[in-house]
C-alpha cells in the first residue's frame, strides 16, 4: 500500500522548482482565479519556514504591508504557483524564523549571504 502511495506522489512532484532556503527573500507568482478570468499575483517577502518534504512540502513567506505583517503559506508542488524567484539570499542560523514576528523595522531584517 505504501509503495502505491509513493508511486503516485512521485508522479506529481514538481522537478523544476527554484532552489531557495529559509531567510531568502523570494517573489512568488500565484495564479488567482476571479470569476472566469485568471491573473498572476506577486507576493514578495522573507521565507520564515519550510516544512515537511516530498509532495506535501510547504513554505511560509512573511512581508510587512502598510505596517501589518502578512504571512502566506504555499504548497511547493501546487499547480497554482507559477514561479518562485529568489530576489536576495539571506544568512540565518535557524530553520524557523518565528522571532521576526516580534521585530519591527531594521531589527526585522535578515543579513544578506554574500556567497551561497
From Swiss-Prot:
Keywords: Ribonucleoprotein, Ribosomal protein. One of its GO terms (cellular component) is cytosolic large ribosomal subunit. InterPro entries: Ribosomal_bL19, Ribosomal_bL19_CS, Ribosomal_bL19_sf, Translation_prot_SH3-like_sf. One of its GO terms (molecular function) is structural constituent of ribosome. GO terms for biological process: translation. This protein is located at the 30S-50S ribosomal subunit interface and may play a role in the structure and function of the aminoacyl-tRNA binding site. Belongs to the bacterial ribosomal protein bL19 family. This is Large ribosomal subunit protein bL19. It comes from Clostridium novyi (strain NT). The lineage of its organism: Bacteria, Bacillati, Bacillota, Clostridia, Eubacteriales.
